[in-house]
Amino acid sequence: MKKWFPALLFSLCVSGESSAWNNIVFYSLGNVNSYQGGNVVITQRPQFITSWRPGIATVTWNQCNGPEFADGSWAYYREYIAWVVFPKKVMTKNGYPLFIEVHNKGSWSEENTGDNDSYFFLKGYKWDERAFDAGNLCQKPGETTRLTEKFNDIIFKVALPADLPLGDYSVTIPYTSGIQRHFASYLGARFKIPYNVAKTLPRENEMLFLFKNIGGCRPSAQSLEIKHGDLSINSANNHYAAQTLSVSCDVPANIRFMLLRNTTPTYSHGKKFSVGLGHGWDSIVSVNGVDTGETTMRWYKAGTQNLTIGSRLYGESSKIQPGVLSGSATLLMILP
């Protein structure tokens, strides 16, 4: 007689920390600095200093696929990166651009230097540090922690526009500074917040830069209209018209005047600067008789000089048509 014994089948599931994971959290500081630049003239580059001050930081970004908490019973690895993301240009309250340059970055590593808008300064530490510490490994945006790390100052210079009006200036410069904490389940994990993401992090730090401009240059007009008048299509080619404005400077200065076209020309004019006027016509534009679109004027002492903008019509018989012609360019005043 056969006896059948029921088979007992066991399914065993063991959970643990065997899968690779990475948790990245960015803590943003909210420092407010102010710096007095004193009396300056446009040919100077006043400086200001941004200081890193430890304190309460707020989570503004995270990316986690690992455990939220560590209970102290298992090991993990960590690396930290301090960040400062600083704008390359800010605007004054009256609409003038201030261009920010790096003077001394100390021990910070400057990265992604080709970016048009921002400077990126990074400093990594605690690479591959093995830890058993209990705690939150993935704090959520809005949560806070205290940062105690200290890092050196960064010194910037400011290039002032040549036509910045005289007077007192109070310029607020928002920027990002904080620490990226990276926790991982394995040795050698590396992660750096992408630069395009770092640029979008909230700029919760402020630099208040105060200075007084006591010497600059001023054009007599903010716009010029050059009129060629009513012309016959047969006699318009090569017609020349011009307007003159005066530029007054309070201090010795070298000013580079450069044209930027706003309307695309119909023809190629080699090294000559031109703008499109429509109906098959271009204007070859000169600055003080120079048709390459730029010239430099020098003030050896305070005073006024004239600047002449000329326009010479150009069109080819196979393309020109009668009509109202219109085009434009922007004239920049640039300090060396």
Swiss-Prot record:
Record-annotated disulphide pairs: 64-138, 217-249
Residues engaged in binding D-galactose: 79, 124-127
Disulfide bond is among the record's keywords: yes
Keyword Secreted part of the UniProt annotation: yes
Pfam families per the UniProt record, alphabetical: PapG_C, PapG_N
GO molecular function, one term: carbohydrate binding
Swiss-Prot/TrEMBL GO biological process terms: cell adhesion
Keywords: Disulfide bond, Fimbrium, Secreted, Signal
Cleavable signal peptide: 1-20
Subcellular location, record wording: Secreted; Fimbrium
Gene3D superfamilies reported for this sequence: Bacterial adhesin receptor binding domain, Fimbrial-type adhesion domain
Gene Ontology CC annotation, any one: pilus
InterPro entries: Adhesion_dom_fimbrial_sf, Adhesion_dom_sf, PapG_carb-bd_N, PapG_carbohydrate-bd_sf, PapG_chaper-bd_C
Function: Tip adhesin component of type P pili that plays a critical role in kidney infection through targeted interaction with the globoseries glycolipids containing the Gal-alpha(1-4)-Gal disaccharide present on uroepithelial cells. In turn, transcriptionally regulates host gene expression in kidney cells, leading to inflammatory pathway activation and renal tissue damage. Acts thereby as key determinant of invasive uropathogenic E.coli (UPEC), which cause pyelonephritis and urinary-source bacteremia.
Note, other: Strains of E.coli that cause infection of the human urinary tract produce pap-pili (P pili) which are hair-like appendages consisting of about 1000 helically arranged subunits of the protein PapA. These pili mediate binding to digalactoside-containing glycolipids present on the epithelial cells which line the urinary tract.
Family statement drawn from the similarity comment of this UniProt entry: Belongs to the adhesin PapG family.
Full protein name: Fimbrial adhesin PapGII
Origin species: Escherichia coli O6:H1 (strain CFT073 / ATCC 700928 / UPEC)
Lineage of the organism: Bacteria, Pseudomonadati, Pseudomonadota, Gammaproteobacteria, Enterobacterales
Gene encoding the protein: papGII
